[in-house]
């Protein structure tokens, strides 16, 4: 806000900083006038945006102040309204057509479009009327419903339309009046108005017209209505006591608002700069803030993980978000109807509920392993495997489902990874989300062992996530043995789990045709990002605050 002026020096400085738009307002408006956008448009030829900008600047300098603010409700003609104003509404066209029908040939052509031999004496059906009037069937049906309610039309037992009373209802008459008044403003819009052409203000309507307008105007989805409801705010201003002194100073300085604001090639060639005043510029005003484009930090981190793992010789794999219970759990030796299944509280699909099939021979092998261990050297879980249960569809709850899907086609030796979006019914907090990313990886080979796995986990935690301290904790996962939890120290959150890892059990690998050691891990990428990006709440990764992206170094 501008400081209050204390002398002629301040006043002289102010007037030379005024924009040409502000100067024109001060030079062409009386001190006792009520200032409005429409006034500046009509008197000064301003566009609406220029008028609003001039008011904003003058108000900031305390030269004008707000006088009145009011909500103005108006009704603007839609494209549908334009057509109705010139060609008639659907009700008008139907009533005119039925009251003074065209030649029998035209009616017969309309009827022949739908029926070979229409009984013309009983009138036309709604589809025949729609064809004859070239209107959409829904518009004809809606128009008939209104006219039938008003007792003007009726439908007989053969669904043919007849006129009961050929009079025009008060509603139709008022609708025609409103359309004609609005159309007149489309043809000759007022130059002093800052509202769109074809607009009627609620304040100028009678009570009866207002009731009709409520039926034919919509605020949203107005494409099929005659009018669109618009609510605009109208603000008027008055000059402050300061304005008179500023106006006098403008006169003394000889400023007109036509000063040159930019030295163009034409201005230099013509020599106009020699005779016209140049507008003063305040070089102390800070420049406009430049906001360069920036990529999202979390998206960059996801790409960083991929780049590092590819550089280590890994191949990326992917899979569907909607998964079957088979690949999400059964193929990982997680028993059906067992507490171990509660590790992942999943989202099941409402429709469709089941996949058509599960590929063989993997279904039979996995079922046999669950029931009796098969050739894995295990006793299995000793229950009857439910082949219908395993086809249930759900949102993938763990990235390890990708590993299970790709084990049958994996090369030996081979290294694979994926960035998987997973979904669980978790309580959202600083380290948990209901949908999150995991980085999933497997390494197959005869020389794979726990030492290999620990080394890989350290690379993931320290070199990729940027953890300063890590530790390995024994854990339990139904599909690995041994099972290891990877923990990292966060500066604000303390120690927390990054994810789990281990060597896949034979009950997982054998049914899928793999007979060499396989190490696997599934780490929470969101938690890795807490360390890498220096934040303490995973919810910040998905924040709508664009300023946090703009200010990122």
Curated annotation (Swiss-Prot):
Taxonomy, superkingdom: Bacteria
GO biological process annotation, one example: phenylalanyl-tRNA aminoacylation
Residue numbers binding Mg(2+): 481
Listed GO CC annotations: cytoplasm
Binding site for L-phenylalanine: 400, 479
GO molecular function, one term: tRNA binding
CDD domains: PheRS_alpha_core
Cofactor-binding details, from the entry: Binds 2 magnesium ions per tetramer.
Location in the cell: Cytoplasm
Keywords on record: Aminoacyl-tRNA synthetase, ATP-binding, Cytoplasm, Ligase, Magnesium, Metal-binding, Nucleotide-binding, Protein biosynthesis
Subunit structure: Tetramer of two alpha and two beta subunits.
PANTHER family in alphabetical order: PHENYLALANINE--TRNA LIGASE ALPHA SUBUNIT (PTHR11538:SF40), PHENYLALANYL-TRNA SYNTHETASE (PTHR11538)
NCBIfam families attached to this UniProt entry: pheS, PRK04172.1
Name of this protein: Phenylalanine--tRNA ligase alpha subunit
